[in-house]
Amino acid sequence: MKKKVVVGMSGGVDSSVAAYLLKEQGYDVIGVTMQIWQDDATEAAENGCCGISAVDDARRVAGQLDIPYYVMNFKNEFKCNVIDYFVDEYKKGRTPNPCIACNRYVKWESLLKRSLEIGADYIATGHYARIHQLPNGRYTICNSVTARKDQTYALYNLTQEQLSHTLLPIGDYTKDQVREIASKIGITVAKKPDSMEICFIPDNDYAGFITRETGYTSVPGNFIDVNGNVIGRHQGIIHYTVGQRKGLGLALGKPAFVVAIRPETNEVVIGDNSDVFSPKLYANNLNFMSIPSLESEMRAKGKIRYSHEGAMCTIRMFDENTLECTFDEPVRAVTPGQALVLYDGDNVLGGGTII
């Protein structure tokens, strides 16, 4: 009997080709688009990765591939695990990564649960990453063949159970190869551009979204320098992130950067570019992937944001729930709320949330 796989289809070329490749490999493929946006009438719903146009594109591709297609409602799961988390983190002066939360709790936890209930063996997506089972029996995410599109950073906190039921068919392909496959088989979305912004904030106005979503009003406070001197007034901490230079509204006669955000005093610390570099960081909410736990100090490569190339570091457990990461060379803009993702060669070792 054929193995059944549910493919999360966003209406883009990557998930469309993923569905095609799995069908070619002999799987019984079902296409599913996750309906996550709260208001179908919004512009975001029309253009987002799981909105109205995504449903239309995905349904059209499923028809071309001759596979069953469904839309599943995950609005509540998305609201609780992604939007509410995003808003709460910004209000605490942190900079969250909603895509990581969406992957763990919506695209995998919720979609996998629903898929297993309808008799599927696996779920699959169009992420540029690969899954390997190691000699120790554990599953890990590995870098895709194309570093430019590698998406392992956003998948570091998947569980072993989730990985054992996951297929990532385009991890062995480059983006150009994926588009070439789509063109060759006549998929209508072959030339569709990649989505770049957060799907529920297409205008990138995070502060505006938080205000519209919750009615929260930013409370102005003081800009202070690294010595604690007041040097100006800010618009509210939700407008800033560590490392930020633009939009500060400060005339100091030299470049100024956000060094830290202090929600307890409603202060934003400003300094020179050199002040933004840190030799170490701490992380919690840990998830280990290629190893069950960190028993002793070890070397790794650490990435502190999606676009970070990664830097060599030494890691150890600081306490039962906190990891200490010391970099060989200071890294720029260590940002609370973002993920630290650790690599052992091409394999994801694990990661956590920067504190």
Residue ranges, per PLM feature:
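ATP-dependent adenylation/nucleotidyltransferase module used to activate substrates
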Residues: M1-Y156, L167, D176-Q177
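AMP-forming adenylation/ATP pyrophosphatase catalytic core
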Residues: A124-Q133, T140-I355
